[in-house]
Amino acid sequence: MERRGSNLPSDSLLEGAAAWREDLEAHAESVHSQGGEDGVLLRLFERIGVRSRSFVEFGAWDGEHWSNTANLRLNHGWQGLLMEGSDRADGQLVRRERVDAENVEALFAKYGVPQDLDLLSIDIDGNDYWVWDAIRNYCPAVVVVEYNVFFRPEMARTIEYDPAHAWDKDEYPLYHGASLAAFCKLAEGKGYRLAWTEPWCPNAIFVRAERLPRGVVLPDWRAWTRWDWSLDDYREPTPRPGGRWVAV
C-alpha cells in the first residue's frame, strides 16, 4: 500500500482548490476527535454558517472518546442526539439504539431531531452507506463518515445490506462499511461535495453544495484519496461468510 500526498488537479482551478485544502489542513486539531476533525469542523462552520447548533452522532461510544461532536457540545454550546448500539451507551447522554436503514428516520423523529440539523456523524462499522442512503427527510449541512480504506480509489463498494450486521474485527476485520468512491457517489446524488479526508484516519467530511460560499473551489474527490494500492498485488478484501461486496 502506498500513501498518497496532494494529488490536486492540474487545471485552472488548482490555486483555489489548493487554498481550500491548505486552509482546512491548517485548522485540523483533535480535542476529542480521532484525526483532526474537531478543528476542521469548526473551520467549516465558520465558512458555511451555523443554523441551530444541532447534531446527531452514531455510533457515539461513550459520547467523548474519538467523538466528532463532543468538542462542539462541551466547548461551543451545541446540542444533539448521541446513539450507540453497544453497552458503551449509558442510556442518558448516549441513547442505546441500534441504527439501521429501516429505523433511522423513526429514531430521528422519536428524539426530535430538526430536519435542517447542522451535523451528522456516522460510524457504525457496517451499514453506514445504507443508513445514510435511507435518510431522505433530514438535510444535515455537514456529514462525517468513516470509510473502508482497503479498496482502490476507483472502486465504489459497500457491504451488502444486512440489518443484523456486526463487525467481526477479529476474523474478518476488512469486511465493514463502504469505500470512499461509494460514499462520494451517494453524496453527489444527495447534493453534497467531499470537503475533507483525514490524513491518517479513514474519515471523510461532506458539505451540502448549496451551503458552500459563492465562488469556492473544492479539490476533485480523487485529490482526497489518502491511500492507494498497487494493481500488481491488489486483492479485494475478503467478506465474511454469507456476506458480499456490492458495487454501487
Where are the predicted features?
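Rossmann-like AdoMet/SAM-dependent catalytic core
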Residues: 3-56, 68, 107-109, 154-248
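Short helix-to-loop capping/linker segments positioned immediately adjacent to catalytic or ligand/cofactor-binding
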Residues: 117, 131-132, 191-195
